[in-house]
A protein has these predicted regions:
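Pepsin/retropepsin-fold aspartyl endopeptidases
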Residues: 1-117
Length: 117
């Protein structure tokens, strides 16, 4: 099965960087990689326990802004960190997906949140 990958922009309020994200309807919350945390050095805002493939681990949470391709406004997120990046640095979870129109049709993907256009 193919992965749904796209571009997102993450900001700490001072800097903004582009990252590759994967869309995961099985993930309850949006999370970011160590690379995002290292690049942007955001403020910590609590912690959470996350389940990875190998184990449950404690992860700090951070305050960041996420911008989606084709949208002019950003979304405030409070992501945890999933660890080392792979081919993507952001996992978009249902905390964001539930607010928009998620379409996967014959291999073509689109996602829109009308309020952020």
């Amino acid at each position: 099965m193919e992965k749904i990958l796209s571009k997102v922009w993450i900001s700490n309020g001072d800097s903004i960087n582009q990252y590759v994200c994967i869309w995961d309807t099985g993930s309850m919350e949006t999370i970011v990689s160590d690379k995002v945390i290292s690049d942007l050095n955001p403020d910590k805002h609590g912690y959470v326990y996350i389940n990875t493939i190998h184990k449950e681990k404690k992860s700090d949470k951070y305050i960041l802004q996420l911008s989606l391709e084709g949208h002019s406004q950003s979304i405030k997120i409070n992501p945890a960190c999933f660890g080392k990046s792979r081919e993507f640095d952001v996992i978009i979870g249902m905390d964001i997906i539930q607010h928009g129109l998620f379409i996967l049709d014959k291999g073509k993907f689109s996602f829109t949140i009308d309020q952020l256009k």
